[in-house]
């Protein structure tokens, strides 16, 4: 008996900004490399492609026997409890033999605290380096403009 092929579907809201949507596509690629799952697909609830339907179809076409949907959201809310499950339910109608589940979003996962700490440390180091180079007091906007790109 072979192990089932598990696909991961990372779902965000979707944006009119291509750069925002590209972040999820990059996250899917990186998670695939990190996790070892062979099928990791990005999907957007609205405003961008691929839709949840399109990504679900792709997972099945690539050989998925089951699909785990991860909401790429920080906090639980209506998108997690209602919208995403409904959109996945609709997508699954084409593939009634494929079981699926929706995980909780990031929430208060301990790994997030490490990420927050890393971002803060990086910003402080950059800020301190800029101050040393300027050899002056920080301008009023230094904190606001420091490290505005991910």
Q: What residues fall within each predicted segment?
A:
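Active-site-proximal alpha-helix that buttresses catalytic centers in soluble enzyme cores
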Residues: 1-150
């Amino acid at each position: 008996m072979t192990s089932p092929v598990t696909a991961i579907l990372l779902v965000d809201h979707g944006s009119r900004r291509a750069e925002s949507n590209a972040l999820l596509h990059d996250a899917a690629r990186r998670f695939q490399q990190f996790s070892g799952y062979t099928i990791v697909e990005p999907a957007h609830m609205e405003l961008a492609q691929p839709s949840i339907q399109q990504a679900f179809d792709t997972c099945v076409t690539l050989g998925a026997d089951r699909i785990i949907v991860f909401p790429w959201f920080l906090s639980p809310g209506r998108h997690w409890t209602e919208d995403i499950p409904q959109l996945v339910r609709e997508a699954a109608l084409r593939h009634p033999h494929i079981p699926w589940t929706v995980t909780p979003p990031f929430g208060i996962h301990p790994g997030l605290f490490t990420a927050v700490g890393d971002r803060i440390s990086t910003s402080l180091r950059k800020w301190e380096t800029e101050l040393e180079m300027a050899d002056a007091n920080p301008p009023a906007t230094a904190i606001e403009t420091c490290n505005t790109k991910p």
